[in-house]
């Protein structure tokens, strides 16, 4: 999403467009973050215990007798983890939000509807963060699990800030702002921060690592490097290119891992 200008919020049509564009940006970021968490709980084993081999941008499961560390994608835990239910619920609600794009709707009722739905997602996500905290107090011996939960809590708080930020900004856009310049600066900073967070979670994901393994032909199984998430730190992700090729790879990978198959009835 490109930065906006004062002209973009001078008309009701412009306000509706901006509110919907911001919503799509937030939903894209939230969906990716939720999918990363779903993968973490469906495949909790240390990823260095298996290798993914790619051919023609497709995932091929292969096993090797020469190296016991080389395995195909492991069996998932299905819906065997209690954190998966709220994550799948959030995913469904977020997907439904992505399809709410009525350009003829008036700004105020549109934002009221959007914010009500986002607040519902926020409530579930806040409860999920509390659930992660409770997991941390139960099993203190599993250091990998403790680090995972710690990462999910800290990054989850970033995601909550983005969700709360959307609700506040969308409400401000539909009101006649006394200082349009402040509003524009706030919106553009929100766009920048959301895109930055999205790039960082992608940069530190198994999927992004595997994509570069495929592109560069690296023999990951011959090294002691792992495919686990890297430390989430302040880093320059300006060179992260999330193009159509990567998106195709990402969606195919999610399908192969059955990350997007679950539904809450």
Swiss-Prot record:
The modification Phosphoserine is found at residue 223. Keywords: Phosphoprotein. It comes from the Eukaryota. Present with 149 molecules/cell in log phase SD medium. This is Uncharacterized protein YGL117W. It comes from Saccharomyces cerevisiae (strain ATCC 204508 / S288c).
């Amino acid at each position: 999403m490109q930065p906006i200008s004062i002209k973009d919020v001078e008309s009701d049509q412009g306000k509706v467009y901006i509110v919907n564009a911001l919503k799509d940006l937030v939903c894209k970021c939230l969906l990716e973050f939720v999918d990363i968490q779903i993968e973490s709980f469906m495949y909790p084993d240390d990823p260095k215990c298996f290798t993914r081999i790619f051919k023609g941008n497709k995932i091929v499961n292969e096993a090797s007798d020469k190296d016991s560390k080389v395995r195909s994608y492991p069996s998932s835990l299905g819906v065997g983890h209690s954190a998966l239910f709220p994550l799948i619920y959030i995913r469904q609600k977020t997907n439904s939000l992505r399809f709410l794009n009525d350009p003829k709707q008036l700004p105020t009722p549109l934002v009221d509807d959007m914010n009500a739905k986002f607040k519902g997602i926020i409530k579930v996500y806040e409860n999920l963060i509390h659930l992660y905290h409770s997991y941390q107090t139960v099993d203190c011996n599993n250091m990998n699990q403790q680090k995972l939960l710690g990462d999910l809590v800290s990054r989850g708080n970033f995601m909550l800030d983005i969700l709360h930020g959307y609700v506040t900004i969308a409400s401000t856009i539909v009101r006649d702002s006394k200082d349009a310049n402040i509003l524009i600066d706030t919106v553009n900073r929100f766009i920048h921060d959301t895109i930055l967070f999205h790039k960082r979670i992608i940069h530190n994901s198994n999927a992004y690592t595997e994509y570069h393994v495929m592109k560069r032909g690296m023999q990951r199984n011959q090294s002691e490097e792992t495919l686990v998430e890297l430390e989430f730190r302040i880093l320059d992700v300006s060179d992260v290119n999330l193009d159509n090729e990567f998106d195709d790879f990402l969606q195919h990978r999610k399908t192969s891992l059955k990350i997007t198959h679950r539904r809450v009835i």
